[in-house]
C-alpha cells in the first residue's frame, strides 16, 4: 500500500492519508490513554479538520464513529510506518475487538496518536 508523501515528512507529520484500502489492527490496552483534546475521536476530528462525526473507518460499516481507535497499519510498504500508532474513527462494535485486523474504507485518513506531535498533552 502506498502512502502519500515522503518518509521524513510523513514520519514527522500529524496525519497520514492512504490510496485505496489498508489493513488496520486494533491495539489492545489503550483505553486508559487520554489527551487534552477531550477524547480520541475529538483528537482525530481536530487534526483531520473534520467538523462532523465521521463514519466508522472499517470497510463495509455504515455506523457513525463513536470512538477514536488506536490502530497500527501492519501491511504498509514502508516498515517504518507499520509500528506507528494512529487514531482511526470507529464504532464501538469494531473497536471492541482488540488485536483484530480490519480493512479500512478506501482513501482513509489517519491521525498520529503521538501527543508530542499533535496536541502536546
Regions found by a protein language model. Give the residues of each.
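A boundary/linker detector
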Residues: 6-38
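Short Cys/His-rich Zn2+-coordinating modules
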Residues: 31-48, 69-77
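Histidine-centered nuclease catalytic patch
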Residues: 62-86
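Polybasic, low-complexity binding patches
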Residues: 78-84, 97-121
Amino acid at each position: 500500500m502506498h502512502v502519500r508523501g515522503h518518509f521524513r515528512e510523513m514520519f514527522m507529520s500529524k496525519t497520514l492519508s492512504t490510496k485505496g484500502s489498508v489493513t488496520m489492527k486494533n491495539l489492545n490496552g489503550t483505553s486508559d490513554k487520554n489527551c487534552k483534546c477531550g477524547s480520541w475521536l475529538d483528537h482525530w476530528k481536530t487534526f483531520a479538520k473534520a467538523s462532523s462525526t465521521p463514519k466508522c473507518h472499517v470497510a463495509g460499516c455504515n455506523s457513525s464513529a463513536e470512538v477514536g481507535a488506536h490502530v497500527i497499519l501492519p501491511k504498509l510498504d514502508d516498515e517504518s510506518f507499520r509500528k506507528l500508532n494512529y487514531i482511526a474513527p470507529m464504532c464501538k462494535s469494531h473497536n471492541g475487538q482488540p488485536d483484530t485486523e480490519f480493512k479500512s474504507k478506501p482513501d482513509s485518513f489517519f491521525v498520529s496518536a503521538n501527543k508530542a506531535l499533535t496536541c502536546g498533552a
